[in-house]
Amino acid sequence: MNIKSLLLGSAAALVAASGAQAADAIVAPEPEAVEYVRVCDAYGAGYFYIPGTETCLRISGYVRYDVKGGDDVYTGSDRKGWDKVLVLHSMFNTNSETELGTLGTYTTLRFNYTSNNSRHDGQYGDFSDDRDVADGSVSTGTDLQFAYITLGGFKVGIDESEFHTFTGYLGDIINDDVISAGSYRTGKIAYTFTGGNGFSAVIALEQGGEDVDNDYTIDGYMPHVVGGLKYAGGWGSIAGVVAYDSVIEEWATKVRGDVNITDRFSVWLQGAYSSAATPNQNYGQWGGDWAVWGGLKYQATQKAAFNLQAAHDDWGKTAVTANVAYELVPGFTVTPEVSYTKFGGEWKNTVAEDNAWGGIVRFQRSF
């Protein structure tokens, strides 16, 4: 055997051995692609796709801390010290497209902590379960405040009454409902038609709401009924609603107009009438037959907005409130507010004082 034959034989043996080892090797599978969270911009800022779906989700909310002093302008009582309310408000929105329109949900969880002298928190929504601590002036509460489903213009679940939402509530004021314009949270089935020319209409069947002292929910199969019409344009809007209270078998109505004087200055006016001259009802909760509210907003600077609201009802209550909402940095707003209430006419028989002055400072971080 010569050297050439030896080298060729060794090379052939090495190739055969390498082929056998390659045939026996375990091939590792390709790693699965990582699915990162995708931004969903179809419904506005803050939405992202839930991984593995075509549903968009947004998580938002705020933390706010209110410090109140002086009188309770809702009841006329002296607070005799500082009242404090802390609220964590978490909101979850989902949206996706279907052949019947946008399918959405909205859920709000609210956590309250109240520490005060008067045991009055003086504003809508701060209902909490009392937990006596020392003198009983501390309370906490957790609340599934709102939860509803929407499909196109259809809505079903727990929300605020269309008697409020369709006309646009009241002013950008903390103590905005010293003269109440109706109850708030309710179970409802509603449909809103929105035209392409600024016209919209709503019809709603509602269960009725409740607050600390009263229950306005239906007592049978007949629901409360709300209907409304609205026209909106670049100049502002005009809206009207009519509601039937199936418990007391009475009705109430409101008409509101908003006008944009400039891009920084706007005014609004709202009038209401009820066929039952009592505030103890689901919709017409002002005193007497009628009530009127009005206000303005002036965006003084990019950071500061001035708000003013005044209201008066048939029984003689007058309420005036002013505030300045100042955005210290993006997402953090400080709002000092001063309110005055005059209890005249029939209201003198329900409160101890004729006048009430109160102040509040709100610190709110929105996210």
Swiss-Prot record:
Variant or mutagenesis effect after changing residue 224 to D:
In strain: 019 and 76-250
Give the signal sequence positions.
1-22
Alphabetized, the UniProt keywords read: Cell outer membrane, Ion transport, Membrane, Porin, Signal, Transmembrane, Transmembrane beta strand, Transport
Pfam families in UniProt: Porin_2
Q: What assembly does the database describe for this protein? A: Homotrimer.
Name of protein = Porin Omp2b
What note about domains is in the entry?
Consists of 16-stranded beta-barrel sheets, with large surface-exposed loops, that form a transmembrane pore at the center of each barrel. The pore is partially ocluded by a peptide loop that folds into the pore lumen.
The effect of residue 264 to Q is: In strain: 019 and 76-250
Report the function annotation for this chain: Forms passive diffusion pores that allow small molecular weight hydrophilic materials across the outer membrane.
One annotated GO molecular function is: porin activity
Q: In which broad location class does this protein mainly occur, judging by the first location in its UniProt entry?
A: membrane
Consequence recorded when altering residue 31 to S: In strain: 019
Assigned protein family: Belongs to the alphaproteobacteria porin family.
What is one term from the GO cellular component aspect held by the record? cell outer membrane
Q: What does the annotation give as the result of altering residue 362 to H?
A: In strain: 76-250
Question: How would you describe this protein's topology in the membrane?
Answer: Multi-pass membrane protein
Encoded by which gene? Answer: omp2b
Q: Name one GO biological process term.
A: monoatomic ion transport
Q: What else is known?
A: The pore formed by Omp2a is larger than the one formed by Omp2b. Omp2b pores have optimal permeability to allow growth and protection against harmful compounds. The larger pore formed by Omp2a may be advantageous for intracellular growth, when the bacterium is competing with the host cell for nutrients whose concentration is particularly low within the phagosome.
Substitution effect: residue 150 to Q: In strain: 019
